[in-house]
Amino acid sequence: HSGKPCEGWESFKTRKEAQERKITVEKELLDGTFLVPDTMTVEEMLYKWIPIQSTKHKWSPKTYTQSVAMVQNLIVPYIGKRKVQELRTYDIEKFYATLAKTPCGQYVHGVKQTLTDKQKKRLLSSTSIHEVHTLLKTAFSYAVEWDLIHKIPLPRDAPKVNIEER
């Protein structure tokens, strides 16, 4: 931000709604809690974050490939189109529950696959879901730094890893 005032527009059905929003925005500006409304999706955020993260932390080619695959196949098909600012902890908990019922290989390179009945029975491991959580936690911490959101929308507790799976 250059320090210059920036303008934006919001529409409301009634004058009362507009006045209430104005009061809220002015209060948030005074508190320092105002976020500029942003339409960035989870998918857009993750594809901005991966190159930064991978360069900053010198990811190996394997880590890079696995992270991109996780985003393409496990995150984007389910919550990728959601706006970062609209995502809540409840949405992430629902997403984890969906992943727990998702067959391995449901998506390959982001494309939904036709699976056999046998393949449909082999579900994602709790380890995979935990890895998704770890990736999202790091990515959303950047979203906080980038002033897209105030807090990370992930559940306080990470999904449990079931040791008996192995």
Where are these regions (language model features)?
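Short, surface-exposed polybasic/aromatic micro-patch for ligand or macromolecular engagement
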Residues: 1-39
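Short, Lys/Arg-enriched alpha-helical recognition elements, typified by the DNA-recognition helix
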Residues: 36-144, 153-159
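Short, intrinsically disordered, charge-balanced linker/junction segments flanking boundaries
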Residues: 159-166
